[in-house]
Amino acid sequence: RNSVFYKEIIEKQQLAPSASAYNYSSEIAGQFSMSVRANANTSLNDIYDAIMQSLANFEANGVSDNDLKRIKAGQETAFYNSVSTNLSKARQLGFYNEYAGDPGFVTTDIANILSVTKEDVMHVYNKYIKDQHAVILSVVPQSQPELILDDSEEAFIKVEQVVRGKEKEFDMKYGQENKPFVKTETKYDRSEPALGELPLLTIPQVWTNSLSNGTKLYGIENSELPLVQFYLRIDGGQLLDPSDKKGTASLVANLMDEGTKSKTPAELEEAIDLLGSSISISAGLESISISGNSLAKNLDATLDLVNEILTEPRWDEKAFEIAKTRRLASIQQVKGNPQSLAFNALNKRLYGDSHPSATPLGGTADSVESITMTDLKNYFNANISPQVAHFH
């Protein structure tokens, strides 16, 4: 919410439910990508103009000390998460050995990340992003070519004709005649190692407790990394939605993440980011859950924010409208996803049309359109309670 994309494209112009930017670095060159999923019937010319305005805003305002602090905090947490399993440790050590010539470069890498300055950020922007060549891809419904960005060239895409029953005629050997498999040459020994002794499985000890308000606690301690992960489950979820307003629990979860009485959505996000923490709230069929990740030194401050979210919801009207728009866009997207369509159809056959489990998670377009802020408050007051909460 503090990014130039969110402020300009989503909050100010309200052209899209989501926007993101991502950098992918390779050995010789990198790729900086900006992606926006527009609202229905939105011209991609407007999206392009909004992206350019976002970049202009970034160039004019630069990077603040607070921005750099919260991004570094998040990078530090992400770095520790990237070596939190045996597999990820092996992968990272191998990566550093291959590209830096030293598996111990892991300590230098995190030091380099934490030493980045505001000047470094703007230098990279001016050198690699500003006024650079770019490939711009427009993807629109086939029936709405007028939404494509001006001066675009149509890319030829072969559309596969799906014929029911044709798969029975498919020959797995087609095209493989007289093409022996040739292994790629390598200097590494990839032969299967001899089978060693089976490792002993050490089951971590789970401790349990409970709070005076009735919340049950479960935990496992691991001191290898300075990280804490937590999960709070509140029983209920979509099963407790009014029958004609399915999707209420989902929107409640969305709004719980949109500020508190004393913090705007942007201020809450900044408070979380400055700790290098993450807090995610979601609704399922049978529960609403809050999951989080934090540096151990910032756990208490992170849990204070979770408590504030649970006890002092903001009920921001603007955030409510954005959440509804985003939910409706998501429901529309599902219509183009065969797997989701099949899953929803299966649930209707299994449970029957009137059963709560037959309704897609998050509701339908009609039910979401009918939900009001009062509905969210009523659900929250009736169902968010420590007596039905479990903390892991």
What are the functions of these language-model segments?
Residues 107-233, 377, 387:
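Proteolytic maturation boundary segments
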Residues 7-115, 134-140, 146-153, 218-220, ...:
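M16 family metallopeptidases and their MPP-like homologs
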Residues 368-371, 376:
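Alpha-helical scaffold elements lining the catalytic groove of polysaccharide deacetylases
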Residues 2:
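Short Ser/Thr-interspersed hydrophobic loop/turn segments at strand-loop and sheet-helix junctions
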